[in-house]
Amino acid sequence: MGNDKKRNFLFFFVHPSKYYLFRNTINYLKQEGHNVDIAIIKKDVLEDLVKQEGWEYTNLFPKGRRSTKTNRLTIFLATVINFIKTVWRLHKLTAKKRYDIYVTDDCLTITGFYRKVPSYIFCDDDINVIKEISLLFKTATYIISPECTNLGSFNNKKIGFKGYKASSYLHPDVFVPQKEVLKKYDLCDKA
């Protein structure tokens, strides 16, 4: 990181794929002596993965935040309400501690904006695919995204990288296949 100052990081991610994306970075930062706090929501196996890693964490939505309704208006209203709840819960969480950097795939950029903490958001979709993310891009300091991703007017905030999200956890320097899985699928000679 360039200097010996130990920093306080807050990672907030809301999908199991982001656990895999951020896992090596979080473990590296912890190994280097930085303080890393983690906030999540209940989503599929995300909490199980975080527990398995042995990380301490805060679950902002232990019951999840997805609406079970099918009416489009109800889904929209539930989404707006959950967005506001998420921002409020992040506000309360970050009021307890001073952070140097926020890393997220969600609303933590808003908290970073008004708390004046640099925030990095990860996105691997073009802006025209998920237009509603514009608010998060506006409030983010930087957007981490594959080079090929078109972020439109937010390209000036993009920190592009060659590759895709899976590159972070499937790279040969990081990924080690489990021998029992290779045997199970008769892949031992092929690995």
Which residues make up each language-model segment?
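An amphipathic, basic-hydrophobic alpha-helix
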Residues: 72-98
